UniProtKB/Swiss-Prot annotation:
<dbReference type="GO" id="GO:0006124">
    <property type="term" value="P:ferredoxin metabolic process"/>
</dbReference>
<dbReference type="GO" id="GO:0009055">
    <property type="term" value="F:electron transfer activity"/>
</dbReference>
<feature type="binding site">
    <location>
        <position position="47"/>
    </location>
    <ligand>
        <name>[2Fe-2S] cluster</name>
    </ligand>
</feature>
<comment type="function">
    <text>Ferredoxins are iron-sulfur proteins that transfer electrons in a wide variety of metabolic reactions.</text>
</comment>
<comment type="similarity">
    <text>Belongs to the 2Fe2S plant-type ferredoxin family.</text>
</comment>
<dbReference type="InterPro" id="IPR036010">
    <property type="entry name" value="2Fe-2S_ferredoxin-like_sf"/>
</dbReference>
<dbReference type="GO" id="GO:0022900">
    <property type="term" value="P:electron transport chain"/>
</dbReference>
<feature type="binding site">
    <location>
        <position position="77"/>
    </location>
    <ligand>
        <name>[2Fe-2S] cluster</name>
    </ligand>
</feature>
<keyword id="KW-0408">Iron</keyword>
<dbReference type="GO" id="GO:0051537">
    <property type="term" value="F:2 iron, 2 sulfur cluster binding"/>
</dbReference>
<feature type="domain" description="2Fe-2S ferredoxin-type">
    <location>
        <begin position="3"/>
        <end position="93"/>
    </location>
</feature>
<dbReference type="GO" id="GO:0046872">
    <property type="term" value="F:metal ion binding"/>
</dbReference>
<feature type="binding site">
    <location>
        <position position="44"/>
    </location>
    <ligand>
        <name>[2Fe-2S] cluster</name>
    </ligand>
</feature>
<keyword id="KW-0001">2Fe-2S</keyword>
<keyword id="KW-0813">Transport</keyword>
<protein>
    <recommendedName>
        <fullName>Ferredoxin-2</fullName>
    </recommendedName>
</protein>
<dbReference type="GO" id="GO:0009570">
    <property type="term" value="C:chloroplast stroma"/>
</dbReference>
Length: 97
């Protein structure tokens, strides 16, 4: 399946279609959108965002704890869309506080 992904970035919102077997970060780059990242392996917080609507599968990541994921935080480098989803990007500072 393919879902609509909306990213709310500091430069404004962007929308694109993302297959459910492609990481959101990878698809964003394919579409020409530059997002923050570092390890690309779900092991740091550089790419962190916050899910505002919809659901993702980020089971490949290991940096976020259950409470952080329950709060909506997502690592875009290891997140597959599970529905149409809206994510606020550039949330590393909110996460690490």
């Amino acid at each position: 399946a393919t879902y609509k992904v909306k990213l709310v970035t500091p430069d404004g919102p962007v929308e694109f279609d993302c297959p459910d077997d492609v990481y959101i970060l990878d698809q964003a780059e394919e579409e020409g959108h530059e997002l923050p990242y570092s390890c690309r392996a779900g092991s740091c917080s550089s790419c962190a965002g916050k899910v505002k609507a919809g659901t993702v599968d980020q089971s490949d990541g290991n940096f976020l704890d259950d409470d952080q994921m329950a709060d909506g935080f997502v690592l875009t480098c290891v997140a597959y869309p599970q529905s149409d989803v809206t994510i606020e990007t550039h949330k590393e500072e909110d996460l690490t506080g």
